[in-house]
Amino acid sequence: DLVDKSIKLGMPAIALTDHGCMYGIKELLDYCKKTNKKLKEKAQEEGTEFVPFKPIVGVEAYCARRSRLQRDKDLKAVNAEGKAYIVDQSGWHLILLAKNMQGYRNLCRIVSASFMEDSYYRRPRIDRDLLEQYHEGLICCSACLGGELPQKIMEGMSAMGGENGNINSENTFQAAEETIEWYKNLFGEDYYIEIQRHQTTKPGADQHVYQVQREVNPVLVELAKKHSVKVVATNDVHFVEEEHAEAHDHLVCVSTNHFIDDENR
């Protein structure tokens, strides 16, 4: 179990940020309540200080690239090689965490709105308009490589031929910096830039994500310094134990309509 494993590893808290939904939140809160009761009883018996385990309510939202009300099935863009491709309109990833009851209520409003018929396209989507309406009480993090900020950094790097270049060079990361300023202006001190580093030596495992993280992370850190935004290191956890990896891989294939042996899935 996620909570038990976290406690075993000495972690004081964990955030549950399921993709696009909050279905697991009640189960998390109920389980933490029972667990904290047991931890308190154990602390009293041993005469030690009781430190409750903290569940953090959140979601990894899909933020539409433009408006959640637009469904541009054939929207195209051009990559660094000059080839046109269909833009995925399901949205960038964005982490939202409730820091108080107002934040929890706003999180519920945002997620509920994302499932409405006019918002849903492939996935439940939010947009900047929703964030402007319901940002109070929320902590916002830039998310994984699927987030708007990392994606715009990668676009800047691609335009430069894949080299990091000079952070301060004009227009190199202009879109990324505009993204930072927009979220910083909205969330203030509650906006964080995430860095992740998921290295694996397991045979057959995908090494591409780690390679990209190594390229993007230094840019994230430098831009965070430049714009006075705090950096937080996170783990993009999708299963508890290593032996669960295969089952998770099968689940991903089901959700993305792919086969295990598909290339470039």
Predicted feature descriptions by range:
Residues 1-265:
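Phosphodiester-processing cores and adjacent nucleic acid-binding clamps
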